[in-house]
């Protein structure tokens, strides 16, 4: 199928954007290795895995400019440090962040599967109930589901997706309209905890209900979710739509 993608910018705007990309790429190419004692130094959000992803996509846009080598170097450093991240699973800064990056960038034709152990560990972790590590995309269930979707249709990945949906169902709280996933007070930053001492329901993608919806929807679409996940999705969408501000309203 031919691509329908079109550049966002043209002319002078495109030239300015290209110059900005060049400046960013140049700075990141000289970025030193993250310190060994940095707990997030291997991660997708703030570490080696994120730089590997950046340089890999830059190589696709500009092949032959040594970005592939930079991506490989950064990814190797991230993999070497995955054990240090094993005490936290999250998609942004835990061991799943490194595993997702490896899966996203690797050659699927390669018979060696570097993430089998990660899948097994995640499957065991997701058996835990009640679940205390939150629902969100950055460090909770939605992020683990995003990793499992990247690994789909692997058998263990499908089983992980089913467990993600089960844990989300257990955490869902009925609302006046639909249902939602509150963020407990112990999962809030200190300044947020002062404002919301009993927790809150977040409307952002990273930490809130919107980040859960595409994971549930895609899990249902690929047939990896229990039937109850569809009702869960409908309830969450209904709640989210009920939060829409009136015309001219301020958030």
Language model feature labels by segment:
Residues 1-251:
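Glycan-recognition and catalytic cores of secretory/periplasmic carbohydrate-active enzymes
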